[in-house]
Regions:
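Short, glycine-/Ser/Thr-/acidic-enriched flexible segments
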Residues: 1-4, 112-115, 123-125, 139-141, ...
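Class II aminoacyl-tRNA synthetase-like tRNA-binding/catalytic domains
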Residues: 1-8, 18, 71-78, 202, ...
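Short, amphipathic alpha-helical segments
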Residues: 3, 7, 11, 42-45
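Hydrophobic (often cysteine-bearing) scaffold residues that line and stabilize catalytic clefts
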Residues: 9-13, 86, 90, 150, ...
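Composition- and surface-driven signal marking solvent-exposed, interaction-prone regions
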Residues: 10-13, 120-121, 213-215
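Metal-assisted phosphate- and nucleotidyl-transfer catalytic regions
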Residues: 16-139, 160-187
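Hydrophobic, well-ordered secondary-structure elements that form the walls
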Residues: 108, 144, 196
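Active-site pocket scaffolds in enzymes
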Residues: 151-205, 209-221
């Protein structure tokens, strides 16, 4: 969305989910813990570092060093890759200790910059990017961010990502020259959103992923 950001993406995402829920007559859906999810109620916004801190019982900040984070992971039996830095460790701690427990709609925000290379840097806090993931019923439904539109900074980030690809990181991104060339011609400020339609259908119908995944025969096993 041109001239949007992560906050306009929140509004758009909530509207999309609610419109779909109202269309099928299910604005209240059953939750995995036996409770109910009222999609028309308030949606929470929570910084990822705060959620990880709550799970660990100790404060974790953007400046917490790698050895300290690895000690936390060891204490909670969270396995880590040797190549991971602080940002990747924070995300793994979140995914292993927190994500499944987020039943009510929650925008998990303020990710460490290294794990969201296509997002703008945070407008207030150094070391973070303006990005979020929407979690409902313990499942990631949609990621979004304030799009990075500076081609110089984007090239630096993608070059760093390509080095991670060379080291075998399966989640890193390749350098995309066509994308960078297009950005050099000019890109307005924008918000970006990716909605998991199959997961939205799962939420609203109670069906499993086998019944909702789009074009399953084209997906790898």
């Amino acid at each position: 969305e041109a001239y949007g950001d992560q906050f306009t993406m929140m509004e758009l995402t909530r509207a999309l989910v609610l419109d779909a829920a109202r269309a099928v007559g299910r604005t209240v859906v059953p939750a995995r813990d036996g409770s109910e999810i009222d999609l028309e109620a308030q949606w929470r916004q929570a910084p990822i570092l705060g959620l990880v801190s709550e799970a660990l019982g100790e404060e974790v900040t953007v400046d917490t060093d790698e050895p300290t984070l690895r000690k936390h992971a060891d204490r909670h039996a969270v396995e880590l890759q040797a190549s991971w830095g602080p940002a990747e460790i924070v995300v793994e701690l979140y995914e292993q200790l927190v994500e499944d427990s987020l039943v009510q709609p929650t925008f998990v925000m303020d990710y460490p910059a290294a794990v969201k290379p296509l997002a703008k840097k945070h407008r207030r806090t150094a070391g973070l990017n303006e990005a979020w993931d929407l979690i409902i019923n313990g499942v990631e439904l949609a990621p979004a961010y304030s799009e990075l539109n500076d081609p110089v900074v984007q090239r630096e980030r993608l070059e760093a990502q390509s080095r991670l690809v060379a080291q075998g990181d399966p989640e890193a991104m390749d350098l995309d020259e066509a994308f960078l060339t297009a950005m050099e011609f000019g890109m307005p400020p924008a918000g970006g959103l990716g909605m998991g339609v199959d997961r939205l259908v799962m939420l609203l119908t109670g069906a499993g992923i086998r019944e909702t995944i789009l074009f399953p025969l084209l997906r790898p096993e």
